[in-house]
C-alpha cells in the first residue's frame, strides 16, 4: 500500500551537471573579430613581406630612373655625335665640290642637312658644330638647327637657331656661360660671319668681351626703337624672340636693318619649363678667297684665330 512516500531504492538518479557553454557558431572564443587571438608571428611575417616588397619596388624604380638618365645623357649624346659627324662630312664634301647648301645659291636647303658651321670661342677650340636646317626632333638630334622661315647667316633680320641643352649632343649646354661681347662665329661656304653677344658697354663691331660694365641684362637699341636684350628667359610658346627684330612683331623682314643671331635652348637644365634666349648682332664679315669652280679657301683666317686668344676665360 502506498502512503505517498518513495522508497530509497526507487529514487531516480541525480541529473548530470550542465555542460559548459560551447563556442559561438563560426569560431572559438577569445579576442579578435571571430573570437580568435591573432597569431603575432603571422602578423610579423606579413609586415616583413610588405616592407621587403616595397623595398624591392623602390630599388627597381631607382634602377629604371638611373637607366633613363644614362640613356638621355650618354646614349643619346653618342647617337647625336655620330649623326653630327655624318652631317658635317656631307657638308664638307658638298663644299669641296663647289656645291652650295644655302638657298642664296639658288638651291633649297633641305631639312636635316647641314647648311653652315658654328664656333663659339668662349667654349674652346674643340667647340664646333654643323648647323642643320630645321628644328624638329629628328633635326635637333643631329645638331643645332636653323628655324625655318628665319633669315640666313649675314642677312638682315634674325638668323635663329635651336639646340638641346642636356643630352642629344647638348650643343647649347653652356649657353648660360656666354658673356656680353662674346663672339659667335658662323661659317658658310663663302663667308665667315662674326656675331657679337649683345651687352651694354660692348663694341659690337669689335666683339670685345672684356669691355668694362658689359652686361647681358642690358639691351641693344634697334633702329625700330625695340630694346633687344643679350639674354632673356621666356615661355616655350613665345615665338616672338625669333622675329626679324626679336620681340617686335610690328617690323616685317623687309624693313629689318640689323643682322641678328638668336640661339634658343631649354631652361633650366634637365627641364623644358622655360627657354633661354641669347641674342647677338653681326659685328664682322670675312669673305673667303675664291678658288674657282665654285670652291673657296677653307683656311681659318687670322682674325678668327685671334678670337680664341682674345677671349677672357
What are the residue ranges of the model-derived segments?
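Terminal targeting segments of Actinobacterial cell-envelope proteins
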Residues: 1-51
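Solvent-exposed, non-transmembrane regions of membrane-associated and secreted proteins
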Residues: 46, 52-53, 58-313
